[in-house]
Amino acid sequence: MQQLQNVIESAFERRADITPANVDTVTREAVNQVISLLDSGALRVAEKIDGQWVTHQWLKKAVLLSFRINDNQVIDGAESRYFDKVPMKFADYDEARFQKEGFRVVPPAAVRQGAFIARNTVLMPSYVNIGAFVDEGTMVDTWATVGSCAQIGKNVHLSGGVGIGGVLEPLQANPTIIEDNCFIGARSEVVEGVIVEEGSVISMGVYIGQSTRIYDRETGEIHYGRVPAGSVVVSGNLPSKDGKYSLYCAVIVKKVDAKTRGKVGINELLRTID
């Protein structure tokens, strides 16, 4: 694996000079191998190691290189034809392979090659970008978008129209991460490498980026870039210091554990926030 990484790192340093016409065989094969490993889930752009999320920047570099080494080509889709550098993940799937991999894909859902989809996942008409990782038992609902390199945990529900931000550049930026057993309400947006920790519930229409204040009403603490585990979050506002105006924030209205989540429905958690 180190040799593969070395090839990618070296090629990335001279990426400005690489074209589909002049790319060398070693680089092309290395990039294609990484995309294949991302596609199968054998590699992932970010993973939790000793309780901390670690981003493998060289894998992002491989994804960026894939755009340098490939020409656009005609791609057949369910209702139309497309013209792009990245093939669709399911272009060569037959019924046997779908049965073997064990997930459902509802037309016209689109997944780019280099994204991993785990067993028992349901993809409603949605979009999953290259480098993303979608773990077991997750529902990606209608018109939801999973951005490039985003990491989606087990048993997550991304409701209709949810946007999970992608990140390829700048390289130092970390991917957006939704940990296991989270619920993201309709039309909410989580972007810019924000981490939503395990078991959290995000209400409908909540927007969270790195600069969004995440206010815990029980403690008065303000978080940035991270929703603590087990949080129930709704949209809100915080007043300015002079009291003349207020600005948008996300509000943690309560904390729940797995036992409570198991007994109480998501809608009930969001209704009883007083």
UniProtKB/Swiss-Prot annotation:
This protein's record includes keyword Cytoplasm: yes
Protease keyword on record: no
Alphabetized Gene3D superfamilies for the sequence: Hexapeptide repeat proteins (2.160.10.10), Tetrahydrodipicolinate-N-succinyltransferase, N-terminal domain (1.10.166.10)
CDD domains referenced in this protein's UniProt entry, alphabetically: LbH_THP_succinylT
Official protein name in the record: 2,3,4,5-tetrahydropyridine-2,6-dicarboxylate N-succinyltransferase
Binding site for substrate: R104, D141
Stored PROSITE patterns: HEXAPEP_TRANSFERASES (PS00101)
Molecular function as annotated in GO: 2,3,4,5-tetrahydropyridine-2,6-dicarboxylate N-succinyltransferase activity; nucleotidyltransferase activity
InterPro entries on file: DapD_Trfase_Hexpep_rpt_fam (IPR005664), Hexapep (IPR001451), Hexapep_transf_CS (IPR018357), THP_succinylTrfase_dom1 (IPR023180), THP_succinylTrfase_N_sf (IPR037133), Trimer_LpxA-like_sf (IPR011004)
Cellular location(s): Cytoplasm
Key words of the record: Acyltransferase, Amino-acid biosynthesis, Cytoplasm, Diaminopimelate biosynthesis, Lysine biosynthesis, Repeat, Transferase
Gene Ontology CC: cytoplasm
EC primary class: transferase
Species per Swiss-Prot/TrEMBL record: Citrobacter koseri (strain ATCC BAA-895 / CDC 4225-83 / SGSC4696)
The enzyme's E.C. designation: 2.3.1.117
Substrates-to-products reaction catalysed: (S)-2,3,4,5-tetrahydrodipicolinate + succinyl-CoA + H2O = (S)-2-succinylamino-6-oxoheptanedioate + CoA
Assembly with partners or alone: Homotrimer.
Family: Belongs to the transferase hexapeptide repeat family.
